[in-house]
């Protein structure tokens, strides 16, 4: 194998693939990156056996071939090199040689046959979405995913297909984010796929703001292809909890909130929350919302803003950081908040098909 590639192109490939390589693994070959050349294409592949990524770029190929080399050392070396182009070559049973100007480096390598094969997706069902739309949908839901391994199913994002609509949901049991998009699949088709959060984060990184993303659906895996990058991931096993009762909660009160103003006030009053509970009381009076937090070790914070509310006193407590996460993942000037009482969840919606649920916290007497 022998090829010449632009250092910038190589750097872009490394950025796309390096976070897929596992940091700690008992299987040495998984710390490698597989390098293949075909005609004038250079292909990099990395996997942790759950998430696999394959990236393609242009290169001047003199000899076709394939090797796998230790990714960490190789990535660090490329970062330190200064020449515009690099030459990489190897022969059967020999080390890989990296040449940069007058400098020459050799890395131990392994054969392609030692590297795990990518899962087959040839028979997978597929559909397309604008890459930017898929990226946004995942960004607006993945923040709510559980980071607790004990809640295994909730550590992934749900992709549900039904009636020609793709629904993406993330939840940790205390908050939920949901967004819908129409897709070009037969309305009779339905399926549910729980995507690991690592794969979701990689898909977000690989999706550009232009072009299409193709999604491949299989029984035990899904794949996304975009911008010369293919990601294949195994799915999380288990059944995602039924969230329909939560999102269909009847809201007796619906009001519009100025998003930026509420973000500012929540950041201020959150400084006075108890570190163990993080609770802010929302008090609604005619024309006004007051936010209150107090902590015996810190003091008390109280702020207010004008709202379009005309009922009797209504109080409910929320985690301000969960509320801020929701507000930060909307771009609207106004968001709609629906609540019914102090004990049922608040439902926040915006104009971009986003629906967010936040569970209330216990109200404490001031």
Swiss-Prot record:
GO terms for biological process: DNA strand elongation involved in DNA replication. Transmembrane segments: none annotated. InterPro entries: DNA_clamp_sf, DNA_polIII_beta, DNA_polIII_beta_C, DNA_polIII_beta_cen, DNA_polIII_beta_N. One of its GO terms (cellular component) is cytoplasm. Keywords: Cytoplasm, DNA replication, DNA-binding, DNA-directed DNA polymerase, Nucleotidyltransferase, Transferase. It comes from the Bacteria. It is found in: Cytoplasm. Its main location: cytoplasm. One of its GO terms (molecular function) is 3'-5' exonuclease activity. Pfam families: DNA_pol3_beta (PF00712), DNA_pol3_beta_2 (PF02767), DNA_pol3_beta_3 (PF02768). Belongs to the beta sliding clamp family. Forms a ring-shaped head-to-tail homodimer around DNA which binds and tethers DNA polymerases and other proteins to the DNA. The DNA replisome complex has a single clamp-loading complex (3 tau and 1 each of delta, delta', psi and chi subunits) which binds 3 Pol III cores (1 core on the leading strand and 2 on the lagging strand) each with a beta sliding clamp dimer. Additional proteins in the replisome are other copies of gamma, psi and chi, Ssb, DNA helicase and RNA primase. Confers DNA tethering and processivity to DNA polymerases and other proteins. Acts as a clamp, forming a ring around DNA (a reaction catalyzed by the clamp-loading complex) which diffuses in an ATP-independent manner freely and bidirectionally along dsDNA. Initially characterized for its ability to contact the catalytic subunit of DNA polymerase III (Pol III), a complex, multichain enzyme responsible for most of the replicative synthesis in bacteria; Pol III exhibits 3'-5' exonuclease proofreading activity. NCBIfam families: dnan (TIGR00663). This is Beta sliding clamp. The gene is dnaN.
